[in-house]
Structures are given as C-alpha cells and as structure tokens.
Amino acid sequence: MAKGQSLQDPFLNALRRERVPVSIYLVNGIKLQGQIESFDQFVILLKNTVSQMVYKHAISTVVPSRPVSHHSNTGTNQAGTNYSGGNATQQDDVAE
C-alpha cells in the first residue's frame, strides 16, 4: 500500500461504513453532497439522489457532516485519528 493511502483509506472507509453525509469540494469550486458508497485508488462513488463517480484528482476537500474517527491496525489510538467537519478552513461561499 502506498504511504499516502495509509491515512486516506481508513478515513474514507469510516465515512462509508458509518454512512456519514459528506460535502466534497472539487478543485473547480463545485460542492457535491452525499454519502460515500464506495471508493478505490482513483475514484469515489458518491450517492445522493443518484450515484456519481468522482475522480480523486478532481477533489480538493472532503468534509464530513459530523466527527468521524478511525483506529490504526495496531489497536492504539494515535494522534491525528479524529476528523471533524466545521473547521476554519471549510468554505461556505463555494458556487453550487
């Protein structure tokens, strides 16, 4: 597994498993909302009224609607494993 995915995969998997609503901001400023249905190395399948395949290279930010945590495979809770939406970097004025 690539080092960059050691954080990405557990985060996306927790969002998928817990069916957490997310806002996905694309690099062009578009905001998509829904639940992560599935994902792989290159795409995320986002479900709302329809399913959309979103290429990861087009994604700027994934913002969960509520805090989500994941744990490492070692069973220890390491720093940086909690994620929460509503941080100061969230953009509310993005074109929809």
Swiss-Prot record:
Residues 70-96 have a biased composition (Polar residues). Residues 64-96 are annotated as: Disordered. GO terms for cellular component: cytosol. Keywords: RNA-binding, Stress response. The keyword Lipid biosynthesis does not apply. Residues 9-68 form the Sm domain. It comes from the Bacteria. Coiled coil: none annotated. Transmembrane segments: none annotated. The keyword Transport does not apply. Gene3D superfamilies: 2.30.30.100. GO terms for biological process: regulation of DNA-templated transcription; regulation of RNA stability; regulation of translation, ncRNA-mediated. GO terms for molecular function: RNA binding. RNA chaperone that binds small regulatory RNA (sRNAs) and mRNAs to facilitate mRNA translational regulation in response to envelope stress, environmental stress and changes in metabolite concentrations. Also binds with high specificity to tRNAs. HAMAP family: Hfq. PANTHER family: RNA-BINDING PROTEIN HFQ (PTHR34772:SF1). Homohexamer. Belongs to the Hfq family. This is RNA-binding protein Hfq. The lineage of its organism: Bacteria, Pseudomonadati, Pseudomonadota, Gammaproteobacteria, Enterobacterales.
